[in-house]
């Protein structure tokens, strides 16, 4: 089995779970644009981990909206990204 076949099989599996890549990309980019515009309009300077967590949360929300909303892993990942930032803030640590 070739690498191309393996990749195509993987992509087909992902599409059945998350919907089309194009649909996901559209939703994800709209969410990210709104978040980044809102932060900029309010002069919010977020730390790199906060920005990345928000981007990853937007990615997971897009997967939920474009694909299977009952796939628990997406919801768990959202909680995980938020928890990573919250733990760093609660410890009083500065972002790297």
Model feature map: region roles:
Residues 1-96:
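Intrinsically disordered, low-complexity regulatory regions
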């Amino acid at each position: 089995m070739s690498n191309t076949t393996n990749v195509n099989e993987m992509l087909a599996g992902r599409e059945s779970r998350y919907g089309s890549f194009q649909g996901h990309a559209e939703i994800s980019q709209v969410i990210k644009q709104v978040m980044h515009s809102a932060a900029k309009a309010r002069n919010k300077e977020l730390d790199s981990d906060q920005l990345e967590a928000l981007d990853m949360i937007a990615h997971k929300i897009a997967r939920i909206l474009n694909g299977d909303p009952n796939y628990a892993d997406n919801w768990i990942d959202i909680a995980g990204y938020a928890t990573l930032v919250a733990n760093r803030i609660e410890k009083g640590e500065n972002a790297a």
